[in-house]
Amino acid sequence: METKDLIVIGGGINGAGIAADAAGRGLSVLMLEAQDLACATSSASSKLIHGGLRYLEHYEFRLVSEALAEREVLLKMAPHIAFPMRFRLPHRPHLRPAWMIRIGLFMYDHLGKRTSLPGSTGLRFGANSVLKPEIKRGFEYSDCWVDDARLVLANAQMVVRKGGEVLTRTRATSARRENGLWIVEAEDIDTGKKYSWQARGLVNATGPWVKQFFDDGMHLPSPYGIRLIKGSHIVVPRVHTQKQAYILQNEDKRIVFVIPWMDEFSIIGTTDVEYKGDPKAVKIEESEINYLLKVYNTHFKKQLSRDDIVWTYSGVRPLCDDESDSPQAITRDYTLDIHDENGKAPLLSVFGGKLTTYRKLAEHALEKLTPYYQGIGPAWTKESVLPGGAIEGDRDDYAARLRRRYPFLTESLARHYARTYGSNSELLLGNAGAISDLGEDFGHEFYEAELKYLVDHEWVRRADDALWRRTKQGMWLNAEQQSRVSQWLVEYTKQKLSLAS
């Protein structure tokens, strides 16, 4: 039976971040994901790297400070999938007085180290504003946007780059301690093939399933309760042509974002609803759709109805149960629990956390694990660049350089590759000399060469992996085109298997 230094269960942002950090410190690492990378919470976020302006109202100063500092780190680590964005906050004096917002924004500007992002300013909305005429004043500040699912993917690629192993569609069925080691058993969810490994340490980073894995997988008591809070978003054709996002204050004191997305759409979200069901079956309720439309329509001249919605998505945030009364008051901070057996076989479990602070969470996790591993390397991720991030400049400059190297690329295709794969685009394109070299076009310039790259280098096994997580081509491809992608994947996987055997 093979022995690993560390097995990480869960292929969301926290699992991938911890596995990458550990592999880079010289540990032999295996990460197991039961379905697909980022298939739950980590692909259903608002897609922001943000300090969390509203968390200041809940006195979450440590979390906000850490998150603010991390924005700049992540912009350098993944410049192909993360970029700065300005946020406009319309002033509604009956909800929060201007002095309170100014103090909040002053703290936001100064709590974290800010080197590249511009500070906050006041705004006057004139006759040409996209907002209703009664909204005359507001504020503007900086945060960042990120492709959440691809941030997870880049960390998984880093695990492999640093000598670790990543298995998707491989469900950990049990883990138990034996003679100072963990015995971990798993099965391939497609073939039923069984695996087992020994490990010197184990990480439970299963997100919404963290407590369930204690109960069913390890038969151990969970140190904390978990509260599942559902967040839903609606996607509509782009509601304005400005580059800025809007952050709207609602009557219930919550905030809702309106974020420009992929040049053609706006994301509106999120909700905060207690959730009791299966995290895999989460979907938006009619009441959430009405809530988001109402908040949006209260602010904007251009009105939206149910018919304008082109897509919706929902996810559950697995938050550490701090017995708060309302979903929005529960801390978004993370809790790391570690316990061992006579100084051996540590189990580190992750409760809570958010996309923005995943790298610090991983660093803290490794600090807790370090005493169990002699000769483990030091922290290293802060100065690292994630796979795809070596674009030397911004994404649009890189897209222009791609077109010079591959003149047959259309502007839109070069931009898609630059903003999706970054410096890995050249691996995808290889020696292609004409558009015909990219193979079949499944629709919306989604070529065979890209799908092949996704299977060979990004763990894609099903159409959804490719169309909704590694890319968002599902927004454009119709049912027939998506079915053709599925068919191609079946044929290509068969071909790969027969070559392997």
Could you say what each language-model-derived stretch is?
Residues 2-4, 191-201:
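Core beta-strand elements of the Rossmann-like FAD/NAD(P) dinucleotide-binding domain
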Residues 23-44:
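Glycine-rich FAD pyrophosphate-binding loop
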Residues 47-128:
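Dinucleotide-binding Rossmann-like beta1-alpha1 core, especially the glycine-rich loop
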Residues 168-182:
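A conserved short coil-to-beta-strand element within the FAD-binding core of flavoproteins
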Residues 204-219:
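Flavin (primarily FAD) binding-site architecture
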